[in-house]
Amino acid sequence: MLNVGIYGGSGRVGSLLIKNLQHDEVARVSVVHVLKGIELAVPGATVTNDIDTLIQKSDVIIDFTLPEGTESLLERLLEHPKPLVSGTTGLNKHQQNLMQTLAQKTPVLYATNMSLGIALLKRLVAVTSEKLRDFDIEIVEMHHRYKKDAPSGTALTLAEFAAKARGLDLEKVRVSGRDGNIGERSKEEIGVFALRGGDIVGRHTVGFYNDGEYIELNHTATSRDTFAKGAIKAAKWLVSQEPGFYTIDDCLGL
């Protein structure tokens, strides 16, 4: 059996990872990391707030936490490498660099969204962006009121695919807010906007707008189970890979 360590076991996705692995025929939860003060019982698994224990008892680690939590994990993994699947969004440049450095020692799979639908949507966005160069691009994402980072990592990934398809630098063309007398919209800019409310799991709309017509590509997640199942699939695939940095597209063969 593949021993899976869950980093962030008390979180929304972490709890679903535990549930989905309970009856898995290939992998099992061997250890769960939670913050100090949090009590959690997982039959057959060690529950700890020590990162080193998590690493020691895992064949592969799945991480769905916050950027600062992921940073702490990466720092310890650089000393004791183990395959890592991470879905934490909102990572800064330093944290991204730590992940890239770890990938030189062990296989690392990072994805801002683990769903098959989003993996395919990225491809559709790239093709549409390239073919419809005269169309304005606007991206709107909706999530629950508790999500801390904005825009979502998935929205930024979709924007990156759209920008690259047109040979643009996203950092130079992204607009994430409009207010006041700002003048006309430039042809190259890509709008990325975030809505927050209720218990929305996740909805992303990428719109391509022109005079007289428009196309909108939508993806709606109705359950976080899709993220948990995608991460488990990724973990099973990752353990047989060579050291390197991978995405969910690699796992799915896209």
Curated annotation (Swiss-Prot):
Catalyzes the conversion of 4-hydroxy-tetrahydrodipicolinate (HTPA) to tetrahydrodipicolinate. This is 4-hydroxy-tetrahydrodipicolinate reductase. Belongs to the DapB family. Pathway: Amino-acid biosynthesis; L-lysine biosynthesis via DAP pathway; (S)-tetrahydrodipicolinate from L-aspartate: step 4/4. Disulfide bonds: none annotated. HAMAP family: DapB. Keywords: Amino-acid biosynthesis, Cytoplasm, Diaminopimelate biosynthesis, Lysine biosynthesis, NAD, NADP, Oxidoreductase. The active site is at 143 (proton donor/acceptor), 147 (proton donor). PROSITE patterns: DAPB (PS01298). InterPro entries: DapB_C (IPR022663), DapB_N (IPR000846), DapB_N_CS (IPR022664), DHDPR_bac (IPR023940), NAD(P)-bd_dom_sf (IPR036291). GO terms for cellular component: cytosol. (S)-2,3,4,5-tetrahydrodipicolinate binds at residues 144, 153-154. It comes from Nitratiruptor sp. (strain SB155-2).
